[in-house]
């Protein structure tokens, strides 16, 4: 273990730290996407609570592995990955399918619009927290202190 502002962080090699970082971003996307696609995704309160729990647990796990500064950046990167995935894997493909069905003269599947709206709404509400976490690197008051966890 090495010491930083928070106390102790995991003694990881560069390769291990990169693996944890990239792996957790992918795992975070798949977990978030899974929650949204299951029946849980239809219950806004339950989905919100579970997504919040994923963020909090991820923040805690990151803070045990990395410095507090890096932990905030990693949580921000994880949520930003969700937002990017929403755009490239849900919103844009669904929009293309709706446009294609309209061009063929068919009625579009309303489920495609509902899925895109759900993810677009999530992106709207996740924007400010992601900005805060990404900018936190420039403001030590956000990651230095006695009461981090």
What is the predicted function of each stretch?
Residues 1-149:
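Polytopic transmembrane helical bundles with strong interfacial aromatic enrichment
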